[in-house]
Amino acid sequence: MRFARAAPAHKRPTLSVHLAELHGAIAATYASSKALIAAVTVEGLVTDFIKAKSEYSAGEISDFKKLIKELEAPKRVVSHLCQQVANLGTVNTSRRLKALVDSGIVDEGEVKIWNEGRHKLAHGKKSAGHEDVDRYLAAVTLVHAIVLSLLAYDGPYQSRSRQGIRQRRSVPLPKELLVN
């Protein structure tokens, strides 16, 4: 970056250019921070209150590991593959959100925006400001839908996005999805 003093007088950027850059950086950081906080809130809610079934049983995972151990591959590769297969039995946030989608509590499109945004925001990937606004609104809508279902609210509510306000219907959380 070139400093204003190093540029000839007739080519120096104006003070307003620098202030505009600063304002843009602050606004982008603000939107990113809000989106990340909302995304983490979704993760906390589903981790603490929602349960889902593992994709594979312990027996299936054990069988997969046995097959992997029979491979003629370096020990490091076999170990890595066994760890990846073990993770198939883990019930993570995405699996819990999928259970909520399947129950009609949350919208699959918002979960997709949340998932993409959460990874980008948590790992410091740059994005356009409007993407962070979309991520924030999707995460807030997920929070509202999850909280309303946890409260066993059965009725209308409004979700907001950059496209506008949408009428939606909340349904109570099925008992089999509620952590005891």
Q: PLM features: residue spans?
A:
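Amphipathic, oligomerization/interface secondary-structure segments
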Residues: M1-N180
